[in-house]
Amino acid sequence: MPHCTEIKVRGYHLDLYGHVNNARYLEFLEAARWDLLEGGNLAWFMQQGYALVVSRIDIRYLRPATMGDTLQIATRLDRLLPRAGIIVQQITWQDN
């Protein structure tokens, strides 16, 4: 079951067009990953000797978020391999 993080879009997240700046989505996703890990998994990862390093991110931007939107970020650990883990995240609007 995915962990859910809620983000409210604020004015300082926006670019000149009134959309969330693409770099801000990376911050939102990172905050959601930390929410998942701090929810009880972080100590286990550290005990196993995993270094929590992002080596690849693939993003499909489907529609812009704007000021006042409330976003839900679903985060789940998809696979844990000997040298890597795959975390899957999806951002949706709270009302959708």
Residue map of PLM features:
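Terminal targeting signals and extreme-terminal segments of soluble enzymes
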Residues: 1-72, 78-96
